[in-house]
Swiss-Prot record:
Domain Helicase C-terminal: 432-598
Originating gene: uvrB
Family: Belongs to the UvrB family.
Gene Ontology BP, a term: nucleotide-excision repair
InterPro entries listed in its UniProt record: Helicase/UvrB_N, Helicase_ATP-bd, Helicase_C-like, P-loop_NTPase, UVR_dom, UVR_dom_sf, UvrB, UvrB_inter
The name this protein goes by in its record: UvrABC system protein B
Amino acid sequence: MAKKFELVSKYKPAGDQPKAIESLLDNLDAGLAHQVLLGVTGSGKTFTMANVIERSQRPTLILAHNKTLAAQLYGEMKEYFPNNAVEYFVSYYDYYQPEAYVPTTDTFIEKDASINDHIEQMRLSATKALMERRDVVLVASVSAIYGLGDPESYMKMMLHLRRGDIIDQRDVLRRLAQLQYKRNDAAFERGTYRVRGDVIDIFPAESEEIAVRLELFDSEVDRISFFEPLTGQITEKDVARATIYPKTHYVTPREVLVKAIEKIKDELKDRRDILLKQNKLIEEQRINQRTQFDIEMMLELGYCSGIENYSRYLSGRAPGEPPPTLMDYLPDNALLIIDESHVTVSQIGAMYKGDRSRKENLVEYGFRLPSALDNRPLKFDEFEAIAPQTLYVSATPGKYELERSGNEVVEQVVRPTGLIDPQIEVRPVATQVDDLMSEIRLRTEVGERVLATTLTKKMSEDLADYLDEHGIKVRYLHSDIDTVERMEIIRDLRLGKFDVLVGINLLREGLDMPEVSLVAILDADKEGFLRSDRSLIQTIGRAARNVNGRAILYADRITGSMQRAMDETDRRREKQIAYNKEHGITPQGLNKDITDVMDLGQGSAKARKSKAEKALAEVASGYDARTVVVKDAKAVMKEIDAKEKEMYKAAQNLEFEQAGKLRDEVAELREQLKRAV
């Protein structure tokens, strides 16, 4: 019997939530394809979403526009559904340099990437959950619209093991190799297996804590057990069956691979003829050499570097057809929730064009076959065509969502806690930094936190350095900081390890920090997408979860965007005040548990934390007591920054010996920094 969604919470729907939940469910039952939930900050939109999921009992994909928000939603959904499958699917690259060709300098840049092992495991776990069960909440970023292995091929490649099966040990090992598992009898880690006599231990690629032990008696499966890889302790003995999933989504059955290679050879021949007719001899030689090498690798190993560029043939799709994506793994009756839709929808539409322009260069100059253009994100119209029933969630819905839903908007403006939108003040730009510093001191004295947003990365770093020099515990947050570090920084702010977080565009949609009582928006009168009315409303909303919430806009004039943002905030304040008065509610601050949503091990967390704090030019353990050490560390950090800039410049100028020398000097300075700390 299929497991049902079971919402676990000490709270019951209140305020506008009960009415919103009923309206959304009625619309879903009526078959409405698109609807909008307009929910103000702090009104409990996530709780409403969780109630809709439980009441509808439908597998759900939640799309978020960045990894930070996705991680936060994942953590909240895990708390609401502890007995169900809550999964996380975002890009697994900590660093990614796609292959590219620059014709002006005749420079080919090889694909280079650093894969986050933990997130890769979570992606594999997500697709496994979609295939095995119905009670799945999957939180994803726009990675969901990028090409993924074909689900049919993926399912065909699974290795099913049953007690009593007759199977030769060599056949098991051969099948594991086809699934891209590696034999490692010394270090037993994810995606590997080891052999000890008639016992084969397999560490599934999608698993974090459980491995499979297969015991053979001659050619018969005698026993299957689950055990903890670290301790070797058996958790389940004598299991009837076990399924081993492939190590990657890009696995293909041998017969499909052989057919695909024949088609690749045909395309290669046609492409070579075209290039020769155009007298492009270098390009013809290049495409022949590169493609033949890939074909050899696929025949020998079953995969090659960049195998995704042949996904059209591997998935058996026609030219121009949409690639297989995570959306293809969803069950028929799935529900799609697009969180912060005013940003996420436009992001979905932008992915295809950027990818296309880069690949066209690679095709034109003989680095890839034209079929590589079909390894791409979904076009927006393709996404619309395969999207299931959709719920758009935002405090500031965009024009697209309103049009698609036929203005079917469910409002959730009243907060159950009685919290009122922040009061807004406008102050002059001339004294903004000093004024901000005095406001920060007032907040830190009573244990509250502050967010400050600037217009550029350089401004955020300079402001953080200036506040740090004046004894304020501060860090900054921007796009250079990877997914897990961002979540750790936000968690540390809530824990009080520092008091001020400076950012640019990341301190907006969805970030849930009830301890923040002041949002300071510097240069608020500079019109642009960072200071549009929607952006301002979202940023101001970060202080709406605190009973003392206030927002200060530093500006020399009130722009149209500022006025619209202030008018909308006042409208919401008035509605909440009237509701509180009618029901005798006294506003109460949120008391939300602080958890590490990613459930990461201490070792890796510490390593990342150390890296983040170096980038932020501070040492967490010595804000006050070790001032001298901090200054020494800061001096070393400045030297590291200077050397790194020289190193990157040398690499760009193709002076690799000089870059290598500078790299070694940077490594030595980092060792000095460790000793200083």
